[in-house]
Amino acid sequence: MPHVPTVDIRRLGDIRFDTQLERALRPSPDYDVSQWLFVPNQYTEYRYILGTRGQKPLICIGINPSTARPGDLDPTLKSVERVAKANSFDSFIMFNVYAQRATSPDDMERTCNPELHRENMRAFAYALSLNPRPVVWAAWGTIIEKRDYLWPCLEDMIALGREYGARWVTCGRRSKAGHPHHPLYLRADAQAEPFDVEEYVRAQQARAAAAVSGRPRRV
């Protein structure tokens, strides 16, 4: 079943990443915590992290989470797992530019929830800290154009990645607009290639500015 947001995350109580991580590290009746990292550790309106345990994880960045959970991966996550193995990673971490669950990006919040974003960045810092040489796979596709607030969120992630010495990669052909390929429909043996994420953002900013300047002025 697709996930359609029905509850304002602001009403869910304590969404702090540190609190949710502490709970996620405890034994769970629903999955093996020695094999899975799932934060929060129950299905809810947001998700910070879903991944497998290992010493060398590939951090995959999408736009926002859908319905996947430990032991019940959706097609996107199954593809992420295959590509991680094909590129010699022993595990994967699925992360997102924005943490709100919504199967259709059209159902995402119209404005950014600053608390959710702040805690999502704490989650990203944690994911980066799991590997002394973190590798981050840009995999958000064209969906990043769905909400204007996604760009500042991504820029915060890039800044954090810089602090941790992250190496950015992408897989598959980019879109005509230059966006990195979404994990769906990638070959199982798709190889990761270097991705200059800062140059990508500059190019997208220039493209947006050109589009605005080309619009007819209102009289």
Question: Which ranges hold each PLM region?
Answer:
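Active-site and ligand/interface coordination hotspots across diverse enzymes
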Residues: 1-74, 219
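Glycine/proline-rich loop-helix segments at beta-alpha junctions forming the active-site rim
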Residues: 2-6, 108-219
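A short, flexible beta-alpha/helix-coil linker loop
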Residues: 64-67, 100, 143
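A short mixed-secondary-structure module that forms the rim of ligand-binding clefts
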Residues: 66-88
